[in-house]
């Protein structure tokens, strides 16, 4: 079992299906977690349930407050941030010809720009500690494209390219930057897909099933651990073989 005792972690998007699974797995490792999200009720439930978790309602689209948020998080975690997990993200699907400027801008702002600004602010803290890990959750469609998601696919592809650049810039400073690219994962979002189309999607997956949030969380824990210390600038695909089929 991987242990992350005395490891300080910031997790964004902690109240969603994948985010909550990441949080629960982090807790089993003994990590100290600051979990963020926009759903105050769910954050309150997290705070009551787990003793080694701090929660903070924070909208990552508020770019002007990101550095201030990281400064406060650094203080509340005892002056050291070891790991940042950028999991928060949104979709605003539409065919490209119908896509409104605000649909494009909102997705790029939150999924790409906010991820960059959070990483930038955290790197400043990690440079002082001379170590750190940044894990960015992307998506299979950032590699394959997808109908009706020009904004989302561009944002996730951008995160992959940005992560490679950060890995090159800060590798010598002992800061690892990696991505995890989920395929189709069983969440509230995929639960809304009708059964017939689910079977069509599964037929394109060599393992013939959707993944679980825990599949993603297990990969996150690996990248958080010392087992991944010599891995940086990489994207781990967790999609049952769909990307390669």
Predicted regions located by residue number:
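Substrate-binding pocket helix/loop in short-chain dehydrogenase/reductase
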Residues: 95-96, 100-108, 190, 201
């Amino acid at each position: 079992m991987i242990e992350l005792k005395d490891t300080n972690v910031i997790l964004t998007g902690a109240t969603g299906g994948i985010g909550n699974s990441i949080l629960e797995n982090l807790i089993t490792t003994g990590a100290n977690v600051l979990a963020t999200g926009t759903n105050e009720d769910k954050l309150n439930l997290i705070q009551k349930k787990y003793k080694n978790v701090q929660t903070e309602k924070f909208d990552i689209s508020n770019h002007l407050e990101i550095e201030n948020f990281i400064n406060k998080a650094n203080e509340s975690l005892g002056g050291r941030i070891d790991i940042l997990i950028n999991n928060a993200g949104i979709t605003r699907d539409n065919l490209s010809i119908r896509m409104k400027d605000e649909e494009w801008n909102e997705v790029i702002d939150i999924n790409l720009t906010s991820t960059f600004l959070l990483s930038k602010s955290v790197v400043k803290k990690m440079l002082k500690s001379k170590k750190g890990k940044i894990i960015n959750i992307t998506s299979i469609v950032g590699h394959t494209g997808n109908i009706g998601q020009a904004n989302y696919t561009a944002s996730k592809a951008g995160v992959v390219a940005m992560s490679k650049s950060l890995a090159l810039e800060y590798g010598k400073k002992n800061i690892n930057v990696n991505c995890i690219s989920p395929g189709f994962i069983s969440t509230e979002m995929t639960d809304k897909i009708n059964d017939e189309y689910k079977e069509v999607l599964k037929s394109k997956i060599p393992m013939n099933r959707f993944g679980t949030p825990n599949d993603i969380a297990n990969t996150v824990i690996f990248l958080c651990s010392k087992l991944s210390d010599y891995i940086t600038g990489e994207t781990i695909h967790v999609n049952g073989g769909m990307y390669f089929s």
